[in-house]
Amino acid sequence: MATMSSAAVEVISKETIKPRNPTPYQLRNYNMSLLDQYSSLVYVPIILFYPAASDANSTGSKHHDDLHLLKRSLSETLVHFYPMAGRMKDNMTVDCNDEGIDFFEVRIKGRMCDFMMKSDAHLSLLLPSEVASTNFVKEAQVIVQVNMFDCGGTAICFCISNKIADACTMITFIRSLAGTTNIARRGSSIAAPTTNQNLVPSFDSTSLFPPSEQLASQVSYPTQDSTSVDKLVSKRFVFDAAKITSAREKLQSLMHDKYKCHRPTRVEVVSALIWKSAVKSAPPGSISTVTHAMNFRKKMDPPLQDASFGNLCVVVTAVLPATTATTTNPATKKVSSTSNEEQVALDELSDFVALLRREIDKVKGDKGCMEKIIQKFIYGHDASVAKDSDVEDKVTALFMTSWCKFGFYEADFGWGTPVWVTTVPLIEPKYKNMVFMNDMKCGEGIEVWVNFLEDDMTKFEHHLREILQLF
């Protein structure tokens, strides 16, 4: 494969897409929720890959027609997702002034399959240059870049501000846009965003989590620490369906006997495998924590729709005590045989899953739980770790988020569903030890991106290979 570089990227055009109709005066000031206020002012990239059409006219005029429909549909969709076309006034209010979103058309001198095969090295070339360089949200809340490859394939990159949207809101926006575009391709009217009313946004998060006026002037940019970005690396791992199924089956009986738990989910199993590998890589005596982001909408009473706009994602933290973390390190644990070692590993994996599930099950939609969630956002990390300041330096903290079952592979713009949906991890000190999970096209495997320091990554890969041999 030829070496890819920025020279392979040619920006054809840039324009601003505004809502088709002006936002009504009474909706001009959109108040963010408290959870929005604590969210970072960074773009989250989402890239959807679509293969070339099978007909002979898959390039040229067809690309032009597709882009025209996409831009028209964006204009219509923004009428309903009007905060995305606005600008932030401060850390409390979005001025829904219809200034619009940025739209780039880019030609890629290369084949889409080459980018997919060498994704770790080349995905950043598919991002808008301003996102690839700094990633801070300055003006537009959304940037869309349509990357057209020589082979006729297309990769659409959506960069959406995490300040106003979590993954659930992002996919609702993308699927609404896809539905509108698909309707337009069939020659129907695009007077509505989609016939699926589940994709029409509602704006109820502010009433559930009222904003704090004290935070209005505080914008949460990514903070810097002593970690050098050069030492931070991001790698992609694929957990295939067969491995995940094998792990779920082996852990199921253990979890039922020990905890009376149901079969672990795909995400729980992969989380445990990553956690276990990271713990084995940590210094002896380290406390291990996993902070998992979870969609709060279905935990509410009554449950909220997926189309509820904004950040309705809360975090749960599971803490593995130092004694347990120490015993998983081969330098401090002796086993009498290979079979015993395998059984110990399976026991620990089931313990990890049960511990994480217990923390997730604690999250309810009642007022008391919501107040605890708010306190956690205000005061930071989990109290069970923070209360002992002497051990804070010995904490190995992982931060996990999952897009599994969010429906990204259902985004059909009329070209069929995407063959791959992925992100480009943020290589910033704040995102050290970040773990991101997403579905594979088959629906059963899981793609994982991890950010570790270079030395930690080497150890992590070694221990992960060892653990996966159990399944």
UniProtKB/Swiss-Prot annotation:
Q: Name one GO biological process term.
A: alkaloid metabolic process
Provide the transmembrane region boundaries. none
Q: What does this protein do?
A: Acetyltransferase involved in the biosynthesis of the benzylisoquinoline alkaloid noscapine. Converts (13S,14R)-1,13-dihydroxy-N-methylcanadine to (13S,14R)-13-O-acetyl-1-hydroxy-N-methylcanadine.
Q: Which GO terms describe its molecular function?
A: acyltransferase activity
Q: Which Pfam families match?
A: Transferase
If you read the UniProt record, what top EC class would you report for this enzyme, in one word? transferase
State the similarity comment. Belongs to the plant acyltransferase family.
Enzyme Commission identifier(s) = 2.3.1.285
Q: Which InterPro entries match?
A: CAT-like_dom_sf
Q: What is the lineage of its organism?
A: Eukaryota, Viridiplantae, Streptophyta, Embryophyta, Tracheophyta
Protein name per Swiss-Prot or TrEMBL: (13S,14R)-1,13-dihydroxy-N-methylcanadine 13-O-acetyltransferase AT1
Signal peptide location:
none
Keywords, comma-separated and alphabetical: Acyltransferase, Alkaloid metabolism, Transferase
The catalysed reaction is: (13S,14R)-1,13-dihydroxy-N-methylcanadine + acetyl-CoA = (13S,14R)-13-O-acetyl-1-hydroxy-N-methylcanadine + CoA
Listed pathway(s): Alkaloid biosynthesis
